[in-house]
């Protein structure tokens, strides 16, 4: 995770995508692929499934961009909403089919450099020890750069709940990192 924070996604990009501008979709992909992938991974805990959900999210953004209503907020929140519902649908499909989703900590992208892989494994292993909602909140804030109020809106939780869970998660992560292996 070399790029920790991500700029707000411009609503203008979605307007251009709605008009069929493929260059705008490519620009959106460059800006949003990491936050989308990381959020999907925090839900699915399977790197291959997260990759699929990321691709499905971009297809859905392409199809749904004409229905997007600019609100003056970070458009990434809307896109991550699509990611959330796509990932949850994938989880339900897997459960109905009886297919176990493997831990993301067991998956390593072979294209990454060794150090990058090592960092991913450590990060995923530590994050896997958080509860699902805690992991989502941490990833959405730290990795995607969403503000707490945007996370509250996306996850349909109260802002004080998000803040409390975020602080508690950070304390839990700090304890996990300090514990001898």
Region locations from a protein language model:
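Short, charged helix-capping/linker segments at alpha-helix termini
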Residues: 2-4, 18-27, 37-56, 180-181
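C-terminal edge and immediately downstream basic/flexible tail or linker adjoining helix-turn-helix-like DNA-binding
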Residues: 2-7, 16, 99, 139, ...
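Internal acidic/polar
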Residues: 6-10, 89, 96-120
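Sigma70-family region 2
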Residues: 18-19, 45, 56-73, 93-94
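Amphipathic, Lys/Arg- and hydrophobic-enriched alpha-helical face
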Residues: 29-47, 64, 80, 127, ...
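Structural recognition of an alpha-helix C-terminal capping motif at a helix-to-coil junction
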Residues: 38, 52-59, 73-85
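Arg/Lys-rich amphipathic alpha helix in sigma70-family domain 2
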Residues: 63-70, 80-101, 116
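DNA-recognition helix of helix-turn-helix
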Residues: 88, 134, 143, 148-180
């Amino acid at each position: 995770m070399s790029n920790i924070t991500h700029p707000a996604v411009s609503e203008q990009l979605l307007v251009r995508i709605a008009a069929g501008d493929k260059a705008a979709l490519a620009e959106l992909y460059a800006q949003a692929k990491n936050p989308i992938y990381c959020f999907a991974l925090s839900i699915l805990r399977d790197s291959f499934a997260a990759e699929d959900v990321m691709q499905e999210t971009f297809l859905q953004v392409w199809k749904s961009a004409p229905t997007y209503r600019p609100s003056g907020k970070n458009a990434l929140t809307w896109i991550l909403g699509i990611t959330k519902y796509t990932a949850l649908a994938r989880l339900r499909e897997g459960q109905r089919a009886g297919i176990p989703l493997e831990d993301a900590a067991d998956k390593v992208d072979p294209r990454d450099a060794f150090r990058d892989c090592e960092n991913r494994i450590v990060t995923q292993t530590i994050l896997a020890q958080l509860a699902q909602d805690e992991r989502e909140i941490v990833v959405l804030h730290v990795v995607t750069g969403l503000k707490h109020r945007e996370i509250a809106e996306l996850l349909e939780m109260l802002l004080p709940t998000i803040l409390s869970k975020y602080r508690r998660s950070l304390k839990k992560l700090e304890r996990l990192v300090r514990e001898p292996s």
